[in-house]
Amino acid sequence: MADQLTEEQIAEFKEAFSLFDKDGDGTITTKELGTVMRSLGQNPTEAELQDMINEVDADGNGTIDFPEFLTMMARKMKDTDSEEEIREAFRVFDKDGNGFISAAELRHVMTNLGEKLTDEEVDEMIREADIDGDGQVNYEEFVTMMTTK
């Protein structure tokens, strides 16, 4: 499974992993797992985290080593592009339910995820995803953004 990752992705995951491997012993605790995954743009629910941990933490010692982490991230990334998850993510961003993600809505969600972005950064994210140039992101644009790597 992990062999489907690019070298760049593996390097990115290694960097994130080591940020949370505080004592440098090559393992992270399960409670740190959610934080690590969110830093990589994933947004697992508590139930998903528990499932992933149960699948990966074979000896039940509450820690995950890097190879286990890679396998899990590869599995998670493969699942992430499912249409329903993308639709659900869009609904999370589209606070007022009007079918568009505005700069304000994007800023709100990113702030809740702990990402303190400047107005310029938020505007840049909107511009990158905003194919028709109307200043906001519709569902089709969101799908394109989420599925192009």
Swiss-Prot record:
Task: Provide the alphabetized UniProt keywords.
Answer: Acetylation, Calcium, Metal-binding, Methylation, Repeat
Q: Which residues bind Ca(2+) 2?
A: D57, D59, N61, T63, E68
Q: Which Gene3D superfamilies match?
A: EF-hand (1.10.238.10)
Carrying N6,N6,N6-trimethyllysine, the residues are K116
Amino-acid positions noted as binding Ca(2+) 1 in the UniProt annotation, renumbered to this chain: D21, D23, D25, T27, E32
Picking any one GO molecular function of the record gives: calcium ion binding
Additional detail: This protein has four functional calcium-binding sites.
User: What name does this protein carry?
Assistant: Calmodulin
Query: What is the species of this protein?
Result: Caenorhabditis elegans
Top-level taxonomy: Eukaryota, Metazoa, Ecdysozoa, Nematoda, Chromadorea
Q: What gene is behind this protein?
A: cmd-1
